A protein has these predicted regions:
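Mature catalytic core of soluble alpha/beta enzymes
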Residues: 1-262
Length: 262
C-alpha cells in the first residue's frame, strides 16, 4: 500500500499543497524531499515578487510606469514568457480572458496555473522520472498538476465539489498525469470579462497542462452556452460545468452531454 507525504506552503495569498507518493519514506528520502520543498517555496516566492500586483516593487506593478524606458529586469525569461502567453490567450479567447483590465497589465489569472505547472515540471517531475517517488502533485487552491511514474498503477482520485454544498461531490476523475482547474462565480476576478449574463456557476477543465486548462476554466465562466460550446468543440475539452438552471453539463473530448443535477 502506498503512503503519502504532504507539505503545505503559503504563497500568493493562498495555500499550496505538495504531495508525494511512495511505498516507503525513509529518513534519507524525507530529508531530500524537505530540500525540494524548500526549493519550491523559494521559487514561488520569486514568482510572487515578479508578478504580484500587490507588491509595489514587482515587475508587474512597475510594468506600466516605465514609459519608453527599458530595464534589464524586464528581459527576465519567465516574465517574457508570461507576458507573451497572456497576450496570446487574450487573442485566442477574443478578450474573454484579459490581462489588461482597467488599462493596466495584470496577468494574475494566468500566473497561478502557470506557476504550479512550472514548479511541478521543475521540481516534482524529475523525482517521478527517476523513480525517486512513485507519484507527485502540486495543488494551489483546488487547481493542480499531477504526475505518476509510467510503471506505476497509482492514479490520483480527484473529486469535484458541488459549489452549493462543499461536502458533496458532483464528479470524480481518476488521473495519472495531467492537470485539473476549476473556476466559479465566487472565484471570478477582474482579469476576465463578459458581455453576457453569467450562465455557468462553476466550470472544471481537465487536460495536460495547468496553464492551459486554468485559462479555459476561466473562459467557461464568462462564456454563454453557444460561445462555450464552440470553444469546447474546437479545443476538444474534457470536464464538467454547472449552470444556473441546475444542469450538470459534461464534456469529453469536445462532446457535450447535459444531465439534470440532483
Amino acid at each position: 500500500m502506498v503512503k503519502y507525504k504532504t507539505y503545505v506552503l503559503k504563497r500568493m495569498n493562498m495555500p499550496f499543497t505538495i504531495a508525494f507518493v511512495k511505498n516507503t519514506f525513509d529518513g534519507t528520502l524525507i530529508e531530500a524531499l524537505n530540500q525540494v520543498i524548500d526549493e519550491i517555496d523559494k521559487y514561488l516566492k520569486k514568482v510572487e515578487e515578479k508578478f504580484s500586483p500587490f507588491l509595489p516593487d514587482s515587475l508587474v506593478s512597475r510594468h506600466t510606469d516605465l514609459g519608453e524606458a527599458l530595464q534589464e529586469n524586464f528581459f527576465d525569461l519567465e516574465y517574457q514568457e508570461v507576458y507573451s502567453r497572456s497576450i496570446f490567450v487574450k487573442e485566442e479567447t477574443k478578450g474573454l480572458f484579459n490581462p489588461f483590465f482597467e488599462g493596466k497589465y495584470n496577468p494574475t489569472g494566468f500566473v497561478k496555473g502557470w506557476a504550479i505547472e512550472t514548479a511541478f515540471m521543475k521540481y516534482i517531475k524529475p523525482l517521478i522520472d527517476n523513480n525517486i517517488i512513485e507519484a507527485g502533485a502540486i495543488n494551489g487552491a483546488g487547481d493542480m498538476q499531477v504526475g505518476t511514474s509510467l510503471d506505476s498503477d497509482f492514479s490520483w482520485e480527484i473529486g469535484i465539489e458541488n459549489p452549493e454544498d462543499r461536502e458533496k461531490i458532483i464528479a470524480r476523475y481518476s488521473i495519472k498525469n495531467g492537470a485539473v482547474a476549476t473556476s466559479g462565480i465566487n472565484k471570478k476576478g477582474n482579469h476576465i470579462k463578459s458581455e453576457n449574463d453569467i450562465e455557468h456557476i462553476q466550470v472544471t477543465v481537465i487536460g495536460r497542462y495547468l496553464s492551459d486548462v486554468d485559462v479555459m476554466a476561466t473562459v467557461g465562466i464568462v462564456s454563454n452556452k453557444n460561445v462555450w460550446s464552440e470553444f469546447v468543440e474546437k479545443n476538444k475539452l474534457t470536464g464538467i460545468l454547472l449552470t444556473k438552471e441546475r444542469i450538470k453539463r459534461v464534456f469529453e473530448e469536445g462532446k457535450i452531454t447535459d444531465v439534470e443535477r440532483t
